[in-house]
Amino acid sequence: FFCLQSDVPFHGLTGKGKYAWLMMQAKEVNVKVGISFVSIEKARQNVTSRGFEAQQRYAEKAWECLLSRIQITGNVMQNRMFYTALYHTMLMPVDRSGENPYWPTTPYYDDYYAIWDTYRTSSPLLTLIDPDRQRDIINSLLNIYRHEGYMPDARSGNCNGRTQGGSNA
């Protein structure tokens, strides 16, 4: 589900399920989009009240808070490589608490990389630098198992993935 809010009125709308074509006279259009796995109403609630610049500052501050948990000293290239890698480890799994259409328990995390790989890399790192998030991720996996009878090796879009051969932790 999605909710689109535009600062410019549009006079026509066409579409067939997977796309929409909006016709507007303005050269610049500011659009806010809220998405939800649950409902249109939830998508409306997920549209931020902040403007673009304020939302950008909010996101930068949130990422700075996470990335600053580890301080390194190196040259510019080394720092860029390290913090880019750290950023990538923090992207997934995604906290989708309140967005699970199948059961209401929280926390709910989705979009897992293959766990057989991450249990020996990013999971220990998260245990050290963000233990509350790691606890919530593990509880979310346990809830997935309780409700679906299968511990996912990978998961995306509320669906378990059976992507890797072998066994994980």
Region locations from a protein language model:
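Acidic/polar, glycine-enriched structural segments that form the non-catalytic walls/loops
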Residues: F1-D111, N143, H147-M151
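Aromatic-rich carbohydrate-recognition surfaces in CAZymes
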Residues: A114-T118, S122-A169
